[in-house]
């Protein structure tokens, strides 16, 4: 009887403790809710949700595999395999850090992966998640052991809007300074991506990846045009029966960079906005599968040349824009971007302009006569 009583007491304590943590992790506010770590399609995830939209953060690899309206299953970031389990993977929107593209031969032999380590490691969930009047906030971090760097990510979903902001602080933990790059790698996929899906951006001067040194930026073109290896001019707003040129990069000239994909048939618009001082390059790629659009990358970052560091150092800049950054020993730098959704009419013609006006994001339609303007509340998360 004594043993049974003690066991019952211990069980009661355990249940009370677990219940307290569950309540802390799922505390509901009138502004929205922060859900405890949960399994989404069999993977460890954080889910941030307000009354408009749902945002999923994958812990093993740090990807953002899902951002959609609550009343719809249509997820623009439906790209990459969300295999059940805890192995890191690259899905939807993932981070390339400390590089974009391949390592050098020597770095590869030492284990440095393509696009760096940030999507190849398990991220840590930091224990200061909170809900405020501004929105639902979460933090996660990753250590990059080969690079000797760390990333601390802060994510805030607006209180009642399909709009979220990500700020990432990159720290150089090495005893010496080093060069590095950071590129955001969002990729859209079907069914949102199809033939009538339109991509617009304010990227300007551009070139196709794969050109030979010392002038890989030749031939030059202007968005939304590009030139294939055969010298054919193509328009890149819509994806048709070709995936050439496969990867292209464009300099952002304005203070605010943006890239938006819209599908009137599906009634959905999805996009990003960022400061040029953080990310001066817009990098685009696309891929067909069975003759149909399969993937479109709306990438933006600190570089526009998809090469190892020795090549970047030799080239240094393209179109007057540097191809890498330097971070001194023990120092850090913070970069941010915002992502948004909007419902659109079936005859929406694409986007000509994105601006921030106070606490509103204004998206102007790409038509000459009477363009419509979409307004998205930012909650003051970006200015």
Kindly label every feature range from the protein language model:
Residues 10, 25, 331-332:
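N-terminal leader/targeting segments
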Residues 18-30:
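Bacterial N-terminal signal peptides
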Residues 1, 7, 31, 35-36, ...:
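Intrinsically disordered, low-complexity regulatory regions of eukaryotic regulatory proteins
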Residues 12-13, 27, 33-35:
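Detector for intrinsically disordered, low-structure N-terminal pre-sequences
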Residues 35-165, 173-383:
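Surface-exposed acidic/polar loop and edge beta-strand patches at domain peripheries
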Residues 1-17:
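N-terminal secretory signal peptides that target proteins for export/translocation
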């Amino acid at each position: 009887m004594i043993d049974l009583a003690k066991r019952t007491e211990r069980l009661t304590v355990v249940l009370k403790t677990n219940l307290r943590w569950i309540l802390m992790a799922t505390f509901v506010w009138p502004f929205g809710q922060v859900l405890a770590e949960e399994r989404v399609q069999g993977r460890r995830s954080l889910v941030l949700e307000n009354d408009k939209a749902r945002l999923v953060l994958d812990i093993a690899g740090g990807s953002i595999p899902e951002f959609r309206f609550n009343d719809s299953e249509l997820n623009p970031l439906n790209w990459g395999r969300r295999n059940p389990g805890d192995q890191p993977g690259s899905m939807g929107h993932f981070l390339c850090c400390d590089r974009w593209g391949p390592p050098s031969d020597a770095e590869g032999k030492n284990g440095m992966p393509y696009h760096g380590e940030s999507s190849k490691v398990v991220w840590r969930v930091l224990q200061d998640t909170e809900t405020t009047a501004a929105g639902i906030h979460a933090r996660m971090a990753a250590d990059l052991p080969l690079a000797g760097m760390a990333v601390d990510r802060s994510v805030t979903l607006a209180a009642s809007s399909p709009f979220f902001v990500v700020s990432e602080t990159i720290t150089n933990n090495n005893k010496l300074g080093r060069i590095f790059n950071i590129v955001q790698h969002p990729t859209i996929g079907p069914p949102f991506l199809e033939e009538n899906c339109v991509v617009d951006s304010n990227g300007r001067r551009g070139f196709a990846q794969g050109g030979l040194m010392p002038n890989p930026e030749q031939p030059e073109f202007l968005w939304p045009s590009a030139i294939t290896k055969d010298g054919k001019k193509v328009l890149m707003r819509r994806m048709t029966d070709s995936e050439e040129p496969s990867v292209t990069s464009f300099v952002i000239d304005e203070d605010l960079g943006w890239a938006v994909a819209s599908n009137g048939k599906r009634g959905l618009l999805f996009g990003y906005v960022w400061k040029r001082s953080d990310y001066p390059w817009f990098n685009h790629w696309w891929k067909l599968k069975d003759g149909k659009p399969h993937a479109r990358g709306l990438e933006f970052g600190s570089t526009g040349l998809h090469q190892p560091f020795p090549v970047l150092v030799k080239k240094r800049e393209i179109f007057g824009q540097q191809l890498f950054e330097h971070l001194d020993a023990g120092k850090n730098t913070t970069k941010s971007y915002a992502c948004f959704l909007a419902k659109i009419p079936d005859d929406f013609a694409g986007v000509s302009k994105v601006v921030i006006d106070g606490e509103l994001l204004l998206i102007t339609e790409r038509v000459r006569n009477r363009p419509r303007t979409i307004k998205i509340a930012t909650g003051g998360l970006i200015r």
